[in-house]
């Protein structure tokens, strides 16, 4: 068993049991965004979170160390994502990445937005022309240091 196998078991149980990510997050005691990332193999659960996920999804005991293992973050099966939804984010960064960089540097100076000290909130935004996806991202600004 490896982390990919555990992710497959989680997805299979989620589908067959009709579990929503928000339900998992409530059981784990974290946001739905962080919990979903952890279930999909991008974050590591603490012991209590791993136990809650194992119980909810009916995972075997050998899944626990994989749920708690620090993952290789940002790993996708291909360099350019093929999934249409994920590709839109890739496209968004390709088009607006330099704009994000310019505006962040103008506002904060030379540095980066942390993806470690980070929060995200995803909501449905009703719109008469078709519902919209609203994603709010908040990352700590980390200035580059001179030495």
From Swiss-Prot:
Positions annotated as active site in the UniProt record: 88, 91, 114
EC assignment: 4.2.1.104
Q: Which reaction does it catalyse?
A: cyanate + hydrogencarbonate + 3 H(+) = NH4(+) + 2 CO2
Is Lyase among this UniProt entry's keywords? yes
List keywords of the entry alphabetically.
Answer: Lyase
Q: Does the keyword Lyase apply?
A: yes
Extract one GO molecular function annotation from the record.
cyanate hydratase activity
Q: Which Gene3D superfamilies match?
A: Cyanate lyase, C-terminal domain, lambda repressor-like DNA-binding domains
Which biological process terms from the Gene Ontology are attached to this UniProt entry? cyanate metabolic process
**Which InterPro entries does the entry mention?**
Cyanase, Cyanate_lyase_C, Cyanate_lyase_C_sf, CYNS_N, Lambda_DNA-bd_dom_sf
Q: Which SUPFAM superfamilies match?
A: Cyanase C-terminal domain (SSF55234), lambda repressor-like DNA-binding domains (SSF47413)
Q: Which HAMAP family match?
A: Cyanate_hydrat (MF_00535)
Per its record, how is this protein called by name?
A: Cyanate hydratase
Q: Which organism is it from?
A: Cupriavidus necator (strain ATCC 17699 / DSM 428 / KCTC 22496 / NCIMB 10442 / H16 / Stanier 337) (Ralstonia eutropha)
